[in-house]
Amino acid sequence: MKTKLIVVAGPTAVGKTALGIELAERFNGEIISGDSQQVYRQLNIGTAKATPEEQAAAVHHLIDVRDVDESYSAYDFVTEAQAAITDIVSRGKLPIIVGGTGLYLQSLLEGYHLGGKVDQNQVLAYRSELEQLSDQQLFEKIDSLGIEIKEINRRRAIRALELYRFSDNLENTETCYEPFIIGLDDERSLIYDRINTRVDKMVELGLLEEAKWLYDNFPEAQSARGIGYKELFPYFSGEQTLDEALEKLKQNTRRFAKRQLTWFRNRMTVSFYQISSPEYPENVIQDLAIFLNEEEGEK
């Protein structure tokens, strides 16, 4: 029998953390972070990490598991998430994965890994084709497909497009999970308003100080490339005003949210819920109760 688990996905700033905690309390669950930035210790504000109070309300896994100068990959996530799921289930609890890093979630749930089915000649031919494109053309292609990459540069763009193109030919190990994937969504303008408000709130909470510490100590680290930090570096170096840097941060976050939604719609089987609906979140609770074959709210 496959292990049932819940996934709370969606773009940034739609309330994934709050819903995850509510579901953990309602269905006797524990949360696994599915966010590529929340693994880093000392980066709390810019990553929108669950607060100490929120973490006290439900057990959280895969938060604060790396130092800021360490790397983290989809492979690391899959390996550590699988171990966390096994541990959670062994104690009779429900695994609830909460996060917006689509590649991580898909890699875990669909069991993909690079294998012998990929024709390397085809990969090389496609790479040659991509090399003929300008940077702008590559980045437009990335955006149109909803692909998430850590850093917008040519090398990463080409690699991401290769993985996207040949993902259907990757070896697909039989997954042992039966997920119910909740996708949180709303009107685009409302999501953008929430993003803008959240950035302003992050600044009030100390984002500038957190980003400055990262800039002073680990400017080349993988963690420093995440949205929320890199946009502020030109301000610290005197290349931009604070208003310009914050506007860029809001703009990049809005674009990232759009890419996240595109990924979840095109690459995964997701049940979407409008967070502004009067029925939310009770409609989620009801659907999960059915999925888990239990009376509403009981475990």
Curated annotation (Swiss-Prot):
Pfam families on file: IPPT
EC number(s) on file: 2.5.1.75
GO molecular function terms noted in the UniProt entry: ATP binding; tRNA dimethylallyltransferase activity
Any one GO biological process: tRNA modification
Catalytic function, reaction form: adenosine(37) in tRNA + dimethylallyl diphosphate = N(6)-dimethylallyladenosine(37) in tRNA + diphosphate
Binding site for substrate: T12, A13, V14, G15, K16, T17
Keyword line: ATP-binding, Magnesium, Nucleotide-binding, Transferase, tRNA processing
Cofactor: Mg(2+)
Annotated binding of ATP, by residue: G10, P11, T12, A13, V14, G15, K16, T17
Subunit structure: Monomer.
Record's function text: Catalyzes the transfer of a dimethylallyl group onto the adenine at position 37 in tRNAs that read codons beginning with uridine, leading to the formation of N6-(dimethylallyl)adenosine (i(6)A).
Family the UniProt entry places it in: Belongs to the IPP transferase family.
Protein name (Swiss-Prot/TrEMBL): tRNA dimethylallyltransferase
Gene: miaA
